[in-house]
Amino acid sequence: MATKLDRRTFTKALGAAGAAAGLGGIPVALAQARPRVVIVGGGIGGATVANYLRKAAPKVDITIIEPQARVTTCAGSNLYLGGIRTVEDLTHDFTHLRNRGVQVLGDSATAIDTSRKSVKLASGETIAYDKLVVAPGIDFKTGAIAGYDEAASELMPHAWRGGRQLTLLKRQIEDMEDGGTVILAAPSGHYRCPPAPYERACMIAHHLKRHKPRSKILLIDAKPQFAKEALFKAAFVTHYKDMIEFHQSKTADELAVVKVDAKARTLTTRSGQALKGAVVSVVPQQKAGAIAVAAGLVDGDWCPVDPATFASTRAKDVHVLGDSAMADPMPKSGFAANSQAKVVADAIAADLAKAPKYPPRLRSTCWSLLARADTVKMGAAYGVKDGRLVELNSFASPLQEPVMARAKNTSEYLTWYANMMSDSFGKSG
């Protein structure tokens, strides 16, 4: 991560008026005397920016706009479906950030005017900013699937956001009779957490083996290849041979879902295959969060950014990070969002203090739980070369790995999640 600015230097650069202001509980209307940073989205990325910007720039007014008082992360959600973690383990609030002087508005951003540098809220209020961070996560491209809309997702939950969708899928699985079929449909294209559909199949199978052993999982994949492919395929045979039935496209989108009947719990693939399940979870193709699209920050489905700072290339004084950002070759993941957020916090602090920026150092690691003590991982470090984000080095679990190494990976996974939540939501340091 880039070097942090010295607090004394930053305060001096802001001037006496900013230095004299207090940190806590400042109403939005009274914070005009010092720079204001507004963060749209209070998930892992947005919360991390607030936490690290507060450390680097204690005299800046920081406001998070997030409608949920408590955020349930998508990271770790498969462990909940597998019965290894509770939904409370995945749910976090903003108490610690508030205690550090970060203002959190329980509201939704409905429009961004990048020329006037303001954000309009659902409540009707308009918030001005000097710097804006957009971290709204993902939205879904539902138009590609006939019959699939928000109402259909209540019957066929994608559970690709935390919270209600996640608990809905869990409840459907628990209510299913032993012997029922769970259908999981994985999308093509860029989407949140590339290995997650396959970990999800493993974790649901882990639950079913204990509680509904006559049931099965039908995993349909629109892609001809995917992350950790050999590792997951081995796990399907080793741990869930008679439970997970995997259907993989031979060509792109061959088995993409093109039509659903949510009430009948049926889906149809592009190849003409018609399938029916007791529980059906269709994960649609994805795009940047709706507010980023409405603000004109996208090029196609995602938001182009300067890889050195994650500054939007579409609007001045705006940064986009996390799932909505076009940050290849980094995956869209909680780890990546946390890493990118620290780069954004440093870049904003440097801009406001008129101080030099440092080359970013980014990392991402992804663990996947195959069974209770069997976890695999992959990851990489990233930097900027010739104006592009590039992978500097990488690692991945080997196909043949000692049992003790896999058990150690499991411990790492659980420890990482706890530590990252503390790091993101200001519970430590």
Language model regions located:
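N-terminal secretory signal peptides and thylakoid transit peptides that target proteins
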Residues: 1-18
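Beta1-alpha1 glycine-rich phosphate/pyrophosphate-binding loop at the start
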Residues: 31-103, 188-230, 429
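A Rossmann-like FAD-binding core segment of flavoenzymes
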Residues: 102-112, 119, 127, 206-301, ...
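Glycine-rich dinucleotide-binding loop and its adjacent helix/turn
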Residues: 136-211
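FAD-site-proximal beta/loop scaffold in flavoenzymes
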Residues: 150-178, 275-339, 350
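Internal hydrophobic alpha-helix adjacent to the cofactor/substrate pocket in enzyme cavities
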Residues: 337-361
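C-terminal auxiliary extensions adjacent to catalytic cores
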Residues: 379-429
